[in-house]
Structure formats: structure tokens, C-alpha cells
Curated annotation (Swiss-Prot):
Gene: yml6
Function noted in UniProt: Component of the mitochondrial ribosome (mitoribosome), a dedicated translation machinery responsible for the synthesis of mitochondrial genome-encoded proteins, including at least some of the essential transmembrane subunits of the mitochondrial respiratory chain. The mitoribosomes are attached to the mitochondrial inner membrane and translation products are cotranslationally integrated into the membrane.
Name this protein carries in UniProt: Large ribosomal subunit protein uL4m
One Gene Ontology biological process: translation
Keywords (A to Z) from UniProt: Mitochondrion, Ribonucleoprotein, Ribosomal protein
Length: 325
């Protein structure tokens, strides 16, 4: 068995040697090596020479904004004026507007609530019943807070609810509210003399006393409603606030009767909250200039250099004026 196994082993070794010699005799083929590349690889293409360019022009912020002055009630453009961007093109600051509205609300609180303490209630200060022997609870004077009609413990007294706010912050809130209206196209500037053009026939009849009070009020209320609806300024459009330099009889009387359509305010009676409540602001040109002049303390310095103080930006510089015929 052992000899038989050795014989088979020799035969296998001879076969392997013959196979190796035949492999050496065959010519070797040169295999071409192809470059490997990932199909999903990201290739960064070099930028073309005509695409790249250097920006040499500096950024120039907006310094002035145009304001169109209209005639009323025709709403025809009469002039084009220039206002500083620091007056009518400020970014919206809700925090500053909130501070201003809270400041105004606190200033309008009267704080007149007042109650009487036990020392201010009128009446005798005699003890109402003996301390002992009655079987009831101990009772002192009628002024005791425990008794009906007695004094109030820790009751309210007249106080001042007003808070403080830096004037420069408050002035900035005014111009921020105007800028918000201007950017949204809700600031309409008109020529001076803003008033409602009531019909002449009605004014003649009302001036002659030929109409009753109820008939006059009803006619004015209906006329104001139709007038505001025709301009899309009425109740359906969010109402309108008219601001004038002084009181105009037709304008103020009309909106006292038709308050659902809008309201009319004099310049001294306007607050920051009034500029934000209604759908739009219609203001006279002179009233707008005075409003901005009174609220630009953060733009005007008190320091004088060589006897001169820095003034605020220009207000309402006329660029174009329409001819009058």
C-alpha cells in the first residue's frame, strides 16, 4: 500500500513540472492598464476667465427718498419733494414701537381711584360693644375694615402711572412709524388746507337754517360714507386717519358723525399709536414737516463746534413742482 501511494505521488509531481514548463513556453501578453475613475465623483471645473470679475464699486445706501404731494380731494400730483432716509426710510423696529406705545398708554392713565382708610371714615370712634359678656365676637369702632361701611385696608390711592422713556428713543419711534407707513404706500401727503368738500347746495341750506339737525347729520354721514368708499379709504379698507395743522370744520364734523369711516386729528393730538392704528395716514405737507422737526433729537447734536451746531437733514426739498393753470 505504501509503494502504491508513493507511485501516485511521483506521477502527480511529474504532471505539475510538465505544466509549469508549458506555461513558460507561452508568450506573455501586455495588458493595457485603464485608468480607474468613480462614476459619481464630483469634478470641479475651473472658472472661465470671462465669468470672474472684480466688483470695484462700493455699496451706497439710500440717503434720500421721494415724496409726492397731492391735491385734495382730486389726489392729483402737485409736487415731488425729497426727504432724508433717516426720516422716512428707517427699518422696522417693533421693540421701539412697543416701548413708545406703552409709554404713551402709561402717561394717559389718570390714577384717580381713592378709598378711605379707617382714619378717614366719618363717625364716632367709640367701641361698639363690650369686650366680654355679650357672647359675640369682639368688635371695635365702626371705622374698622371688618365692619360694613368701615375703612378699606390697603385700598387704592391717587398715583402716577407714567413711566420714563429716553427722548431720543421716543423720537426714533415716531420716525419709525412714519417710515413703516411710507414703505407700505400708506402715507399720503397733501397740500395745506385739507378739508372735506361738502356740496355747496347743502352748505347753503344748512347755513340758512332750512334743514333740521337730524337731517343735516344724516346727510353728512351718508356723504362721508360715499366719499370714503369711492376712494377705497373707508371702513372696508381699514379706515383712514386725517392729520391737519389746525381744526377744519367740515373735516372734523364729518368724521365725528361718521367715525366708522375714519377720524380727523390735529397735529398736537397725535401719538405714535395713532400712526399705526388705521389703514392709512393722510397728512398735510406742513404738518408732516413739523412732526419730523419736533422728533429728530437723535439727529441733532447739542455740541457746538466753532460756534456752529450740526443741523438735522433737510426737510421737504422740492424737486419738481407742477404748474398751476
Amino acid at each position: 500500500m505504501a509503494g502504491k501511494g508513493l507511485k501516485s505521488l511521483n506521477e502527480a509531481m511529474n504532471a505539475l513540472s510538465i505544466a509549469s514548463k508549458s506555461c513558460r513556453a507561452l508568450p506573455m501578453r501586455q495588458s493595457s492598464i485603464l485608468p480607474c475613475r468613480r462614476s459619481m465623483a464630483s469634478v470641479a471645473t475651473p472658472p472661465a476667465a470671462n465669468i470672474t470679475r472684480s466688483v470695484s464699486e462700493p455699496w451706497q445706501p439710500i440717503t434720500n427718498v421721494p415724496v409726492t404731494v397731492y391735491s385734495f380731494p382730486e389726489l392729483e400730483p402737485r409736487s415731488l419733494e425729497s426727504y432724508s432716509a433717516r426720516h422716512l426710510h428707517l427699518p422696522l423696529r417693533r421693540d421701539i414701537l412697543h416701548l413708545a406705545v406703552i409709554y404713551e398708554g402709561d402717561s394717559t392713565r389718570r390714577g384717580m381711584a381713592s378709598t378711605k382708610t379707617r382714619y378717614e371714615v366719618h363717625g364716632s370712634h367709640k367701641k361698639m360693644s363690650p369686650q366680654k359678656g355679650t357672647g359675640n365676637a369682639r368688635r371695635g369702632t365702626r371705622q374698622s375694615p371688618l365692619m360694613k361701611g368701615g375703612g378699606k385696608t390697603f385700598g387704592p390711592k391717587p398715583r402716577d402711572f407714567s413711566t420714563k422713556l429716553n427722548k431720543k428713543v421716543y423720537d426714533l419711534a415716531w420716525r419709525t412709524a412714519l417710515s413703516y407707513r411710507y414703505k407700505r404706500g400708506e402715507l399720503i401727503v397733501t397740500e395745506d388746507g385739507l378739508d372735506l368738500p361738502l356740496p355747496n347746495d347743502f352748505l347753503w341750506l344748512a347755513g340758512g337754517g332750512k334743514l333740521s339737525r337730524e337731517l343735516e347729520d344724516g346727510y353728512v354721514r351718508k356723504w362721508v360714507h360715499e366719499f370714503m368708499t369711492s376712494l377705497n379709504w373707508g371702513k372696508e379698507a381699514g379706515r383712514t386717519t386725517f392729520i391737519t395743522g389746525d381744526k377744519r370744520p367740515n373735516l372734523f364734523t364729518g368724521f365725528e358723525l361718521a367715525g366708522a369711516e375714519g377720524r380727523a386729528l390735529e397735529l398736537w393730538d397725535v401719538d405714535v399709536k395713532d400712526l399705526l392704528e388705521t389703514g392709512r395716514i393722510v397728512i398735510e405737507r406742513s404738518a408732516l414737516k413739523e412732526m419730523i422737526e419736533d422728533h429728530q433729537s437723535d439727529l441733532v447734536t447739542r455740541v457746538a463746534v466753532q460756534g456752529l451746531r450740526q443741523k438735522g437733514p433737510n426737510l421737504g426739498e422740492v424737486l419738481v413742482r407742477a404748474p398751476r393753470y
